[in-house]
Amino acid sequence: VASVSSLLLLASCSDDDNVPPDVTKKNPTTFIKDAEKVAMLRSMKDVDGSGRLYEINYTADYKLDDVLKSGFTETNQLFNYVAYLLYDSLPGKKAQVSFDAGCSAFAVPDRQSGNFLMGRNYDFCHATEDGKGYKSIAAIIVHTAPEGGKKSISMVDGMQLGFGQGFYTDGKSDLSPLMGLPYAALDGINEDGFAIGVLALKENQTK
């Protein structure tokens, strides 16, 4: 099995279990009651202390086989099904996911170490409600190691789940949507060095 290292956002990714600040306990998990799930959601760490880059070890079963069998291809339809599978109770309002992006990514083998490197820029432009500025996003590095599957590292734009800068310790943001992190990834790399990136640009299709 190949060793994998990631340069996602030029941030170091480790398994160091730093305890998040107590203030995170104030953030609700309205639709998640299972103790292990709640503990996982509260284990996220703020990588540089700015509220712009977070990291989490996603240890729950995210029911990938069930999702693949469902055959859903439309984004909001998919996330409603993910909520059905992973939430402990369902909200009255159906899930809505927002996508508005412009980005680039790369994945290359490191000739010296034999590892695989992946990086990307996150230049998403999420406009404010008045259209006069842009919201500060929170990017989330997600580690997954599903039973019987491949370990991977992926990156999520938190704003697509409604999470902006500092959401994790604002005392009010419901952390329940974090259960859908494995399905909100825009790019990632697995332990074999297989990398996928989802990129969007407001340009005409190549002919």
For the regions a protein language model found, what residue spans apply to each?
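C-terminal motif of bacterial Sec signal peptides marking the signal peptidase cleavage site
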Residues: 9-12
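N-terminal mature-domain region immediately after signal-peptide cleavage
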Residues: 14-207
